[in-house]
Amino acid sequence: IQTIRFGDRITVQLQPLPEPYRELAVPRFILQPLFENAYNHGVEKMENGLIQLRFKMQPEFLNIYVENNGSCPDAELEKLTQYLNSTDRKAECTALKNVKLRMQMQGGDLQVSHGTLGGFGVSLRLPLHPAHSLNTEQQNGQPQKEETNHADTVACG
């Protein structure tokens, strides 16, 4: 849909996920809001917009980066960082806050920063062994089955 809307004005570069990580259970819809924000708040008005998805593997985590080459004023970045780190349950729940909360439920995190492309960047830190799947001890004499129905939304307040 975004390709039809923006045509050739915006390029999206997607790094393929390395094979060993393709079976990793992740919370649903964690990338869609990041791409929507990159389009709508980062590169929407640009003639040569660029959105990039890339991965960095670590022994215990998979880091996922969504970045754009739009503007990223320091004041806006600081305000967003404070909002994302706020524990105020009365605060408005945006897509980024929702993704951050869902990542934290899995033992991961979401951080915002200046991206390597010069614009806004979001990094997701996803544990290779989520907290809920680490406890495979038996309960009532039965082995625990790994959770596969990941939440789509989280109540923020």
Language model features by range: what are they?
Residues 1-111, 120:
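Two-component histidine phosphotransfer core
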Residues 120-129:
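Short C-terminal beta-strand
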Residues 140-157:
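Long, low-complexity, intrinsically disordered segments
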Residues 32, 128-132:
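Short, intrinsically disordered, low-complexity segments enriched in Ser/Thr and Pro
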Residues 75-77, 133-138:
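Short, charged, solvent-exposed linker or helix-capping segments at domain edges/interfaces
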